Amino acid sequence: MLSVIFILIALYIFAQIGGAFGNSGYRGKARMQLAEAKILVALLAKVAKSDGHVSESEAAMISEILDDLVRQMGGGEREREALKLVYKLEKENLANVRELAEKYNQTYRPSPSRKTGLIYFFLNLAYVDRGFSAAERRTISQICDGLGLPEHIQS
């Protein structure tokens, strides 16, 4: 029950920061494309698996995030399956975290507030299982580095 409440709180925070994966920053522009969503899901997978396992709470939250991303893209089951496959593959390879974040940063040039929102969301995902491991901290730090966030934001 407590984990359900925590997930609801995390999703509320997610909505309040403008939906780190949603269309915030896209007003007046095209919707998020599948290629961008794939990079974000890959980073999400690495944060979720960085402590060695994906908890039930994390899995439930990730499922809702995939649904939200598909809605934001205006996609359907095909896009959800594509994102699910990216998640499945990327959670097994924790070696390219910084490179993926750099690719996202260079390709999509997110605003500083969007970068901060993404990190805030990754932190919430990491803590949804009531723990924040050193491995999760390293993974999120690598994402910060790849996004070009200053050191003082990372600590």
Language-model features, listed with the residues they occupy:
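Catalytic "initiation/cleavage/transfer" segments centered on a nucleophilic residue
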Residues: 51
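Small-residue-enriched hydrophobic alpha-helices in membranes
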Residues: 1-45, 56-155
